[in-house]
From Swiss-Prot:
One of its GO terms (molecular function) is 3'-5'-RNA exonuclease activity. Residues 554-613 form the KH domain. GO terms for biological process: mRNA catabolic process; RNA catabolic process; RNA processing. Component of the RNA degradosome, which is a multiprotein complex involved in RNA processing and mRNA degradation. Its cofactor is Mg(2+). Its main location: cytoplasm. Keywords: Cytoplasm, Magnesium, Metal-binding, Nucleotidyltransferase, RNA-binding, Transferase. This is Polyribonucleotide nucleotidyltransferase. Pfam families: KH_1, PNPase, RNase_PH, RNase_PH_C, S1. It comes from Xanthomonas campestris pv. campestris (strain ATCC 33913 / DSM 3586 / NCPPB 528 / LMG 568 / P 25). InterPro entries: ExoRNase_PH_dom1 (IPR001247), ExoRNase_PH_dom2 (IPR015847), ExoRNase_PH_dom2_sf (IPR036345), KH_dom (IPR004087), KH_dom_type_1 (IPR004088), KH_dom_type_1_sf (IPR036612), NA-bd_OB-fold (IPR012340), PNPase (IPR012162).
Amino acid sequence: MAKITKTFQYGKHTVTLETGEVARQASGAVIVKMDDTVLLVTAVAAKTAREGQDFFPLTVDYQEKFYAGGRIPGGFFKREGRATEKETLISRLIDRPIRPLFPEDYKNEVQIIATVMSMNPDIDGDIAALIGASAALSLAGTPFNGPIGAAKVGYKNGEYILNPTITELKDSQLELVVAGTANAVLMVESEAALLSEEVMLGAVTFGHREMQKVINIINELTVEAGTKPSTWVAPAKNTALISALKEAVGTQLAGAFQVRDKLQRRDAISAIKKDVLESLAGRVASEGWSSAELSKEFGELEYHTMRDSVLETKVRIDGRALDTVRPISVQAGVLPRTHGSALFTRGETQAIVVTTLGTARDGQVIDAVAGEYKENFLFHYNFPPYSVGECGRFGAPKRREIGHGRLAKRGVLAVMPSLEEFPYTIRVVSEITESNGSSSMASVCGSSLALMDAGVPVKAPVAGIAMGLVKEDDRFVVLSDILGDEDHLGDMDFKVAGTAEGVSALQMDIKIEGITEEIMKQALQQAKAGRLHILGEMSKALTTPRQELSDYAPRLLTIKIHPDKIREVIGKGGSTIQAITKETGTQIDIQDDGTIIIASVNAIAAQAAKSRIEQITSDVEPGRIYEGKVAKIMDFGAFVTILPGKDGLVHVSQISSERVEKVGDKLKEGDLVRVKVLEVDKQGRIRLSIKAVEEGEGVPASAE
């Protein structure tokens, strides 16, 4: 196939799509250029599904090569290793709008690999990767109901910005990524500076409108490439099996969905499934039916039973009304030795969230393609298998945990103090101890409380809520504070976090087309009412940050010295700074601009370290009297240390008003003596006198 190129203007960037020259053995491959940021995105689809495959094995891997930024990886191994957090998050960002566009019965393995091969540090690879994945899948001839477009939206001075650069985002009140087809929004991921619901919805519709040019270009590309449509045909439904199953189940599932407790409901449904499969076992054998298909169709019955029930009765499977939030319980300060903690329970979803305060050196150093930087606010989300009553793998965080942690972090970022306002590294850990839907939003609520319990000066409390949707034709219901089953069996997962003032984070995943702007508007308004209710419940535990830090949290003292004096504080080979930290038990960080941060759980020790540094950096003043220690005896006099790192000479003629024949007769090393500074010459040499003090001259150094 000859090389095909398509170029278009997208915001401030020139975007080029190329296919037919590179990676020609992949099912679909495209090079995406967004100015100087260049990605190769490939899609490969297996010709057939594996035997017994009962799920759609789609994998997406986004990777940033260090050579893209002209760098060699740091550390011992000089090659890229496992996926970074950013790579994992962008991989999920690509997966989410693509997965629902494949047919439900399609089980062939599909793999998308997006490789960043050149990176302009001001143009991120996320939007280019989404566009490339859409184009590669469209070229692959899979039964992909795309293409999709993607756009990043900023907001500044009341105006939306299409595909802002990283520099522009620093001053933007919004960073929102939206992806979807020509007719529908499928995915939204965003963080915002407490914006209104109207501004957030406007950003979604703005991005969806602008991305149409991407969809049109991809359609043109596939036509020119001569891509043949997929020949895959969905397997025919076994109507006899479905009829037999419905007859065997009867109204049992409807009854099971009236059980309000999650675990009891799960057990009731499992018992019905077991009985039905056993009752139909003979017919399955005689008719040659597939037991896997029978199990799948049972799941379809579950899906329709729950949906039909809530659409008809407007009552949910746990008995709540559509807009009712589950009962909430909150406690702050639940763990005695931590710096800040909270227990947040909402129905059958529960999180223990802990805040830890550290110094600047505790920040995480990130070795990224665009350059090394330090992260001083860390948010980690853990989802152990016991939280859903199961056994499972326990260890390194999975992609889902990284994604949920990032969403929860976005939820509280807008209210966090700057490093200048609160010079601590802050780590928040959310341990999900129970889960029945919306655990990431429970993490937002719990983290807000734990941060305030730790005394972090957040601007306002933050709460989060997950919304759902069930839609059949023109009938639809919007659900507040969804359960796990409502998420799994519903059409939308719509998470909103924010304060009473506005939205700080919005994440949306939609499984169907036909979600109108009016439906999204209703969901946002219903979410706001739920968020305000949750904030009211949270206020029963804490309304503002505690005034005092925990007794176990480090106290920070900050002093400023002239940058030229940094070497004096450090000392030869680090001897001075090491002596101070060892003797006072403190941790000391020195920045290039002369800012010194002293950290210690003991306030007295921190003050002692501060005094030592002030002594070292203070200038020796002629005419002042200091108390010093004799450091060395010489024939012509004695050297006396008057300040740390500062020695002066007492000449033999200045030791006493009487004649001194031998210095050792009057002074010994280690003696404490009071001396007056006679002179500090241009070379910094200090002349001292003991005689002048005895004669009553000079002003004590302590007299300020």
